Amino acid sequence: GLLSVLGSVAKHVLPHVVPVIAEHL
């Protein structure tokens, strides 16, 4: 379903987003 798609997208996106956010913190 839509949630599983969002979940798989999040798994690909989060590893790239988290380090960027951490740099600004």
Swiss-Prot record:
Tissues expressing this chain: Expressed by the skin parotoid and/or rostral glands.
Signal peptide span: none
Superkingdom of the organism of origin: Eukaryota
Pfam families membership: Caerin_1 (PF07440)
Post-translational modification: The major product is Caerin-1.1; in addition, different peptides are produced that are missing some amino acid residues at the N-terminus. Caerin-1.1.1 is inactive.
Primary site of residence: secreted
Record's keyword terms, sorted: Amidation, Amphibian defense peptide, Antibiotic, Antimicrobial, Antiviral defense, Immunity, Innate immunity, Secreted
InterPro entries found in the cross-reference section: Caerin_1
Residues modified to Leucine amide: L25
Biological process terms in GO annotation: defense response to bacterium; defense response to virus; innate immune response
Keyword ATP-binding attached: no
Subcellular location(s) of the protein: Secreted
GO cellular component, one term: extracellular region
S-S bridge residues: none
Family that this chain belongs to: Belongs to the frog skin active peptide (FSAP) family. Caerin subfamily.
Domain notes: Contains two amphipathic alpha helix regions separated by a region of less-defined helicity and greater flexibility.
Protein name as annotated: Caerin-1.1
Species in which this protein is naturally found: Ranoidea splendida (Magnificent tree frog)
